[in-house]
Amino acid sequence: MLRVDTSSFFLIVLSAAVAAITVAVLPKRIAPPVVVLELLLGIVIGPHGFSLASTDEFSLFFSNLGLGMLFYFAGYEINFDRIRGAPVRLGGRGWLMSIGIAYGLGGVLALLGVIDSFVYTGSAMATTAIGTLIPILRDTGEMKTRFGTYLLGAGAVGEFGPILLVTLFLSTGHPLREAVILVFFVAIAVTIALLSMGVVWRELPMIERTLEASDQLAVRVTVVLIFGLVGLAGHLHLDILLGGFVAGMITRAALRGQEISVFDSKLTAVGFGFFIPFFFIYSGMNFDLEALGSAGAMAKLAMFFGLFLVVRGAPALLLYRHVLPSPQRAALAFYCATELPLVVAITTLAVEAGQMKTSTAAGLVGAAMLSTLVFPFVARGLLEGAGDAAHA
């Protein structure tokens, strides 16, 4: 029987509310991204903080649903008609450069005995948390800008590429079997997408009418799609991130470029209002502060924090020099180097496979959390400074 710790559950919900209230009352220039506060509050209330709340299977269940919703919005916000051409082409080149740099640096660290596996460590460093960045970009109004288009292109490849790496090569030792399972999953997803596109295109006026009704047909069907594909991915032993991401892409394809603001706002309320904060707070609660107790572990955290910027930021500075001005390129570098969900997923797999020490995993996850705390702040400051200079 599933044990439910109601007090811990309430504290997680309370922490989500406190984070939102704090961001709302602080002046905009100093207000941190809400996901940052959610991570910090998770650390504070968790077993490695003040032990006010404990982790259990019930909270883990909601955290996984939140992770699925987070990647749903990543897939939904990435309009491939918008990013095709230069944005996705440059994003692909940048990620391939990042993989090369990450594996090269990982190989050196493995030879020096600092890490065990350059593949797992390198793969973790070559990610971009576009799902984490989307709420930040929404709040700052960057989603619809030219800069936002290039960032979405870089982030889409920086998120989806590592998901495929995790699915095919890192989660098991049988890439051929995983490829067959992935093809099966994609076939199901494509079938759902084609059916959805036909139904939505034919019944769009009726669907729009139900958005203001109590039955909330569109929202309910979308939630079924998200959790259904997340559950299917988990059942097939694929990463649940893939299920959420594909669900978002299917929804975007079904709408065929239609922007339905009421639908967007209702899904945003469901996702960012409840499920997604669970993932960030639960991630904070699971962060092992004790594993960073040694000087060596802290040195790894600082090293990985800097390497994230080298691996993901340096290609952005190099490749976008003809399409973005210097302040925006610098901001893009910091945004691209922001990492978290996939770092958590990859380090978990690596530790379970015996390919990574817990101190290395803690250093990577700690650096990823620190990147989420710091890099968006720096990027936002660079963009605001460029905007002020342009209007001076």
Question: Model-derived features: where do they sit?
Answer:
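The feature identifies polytopic integral membrane transport proteins across all domains of life
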Residues: 53, 57, 84-95, 112-125, ...
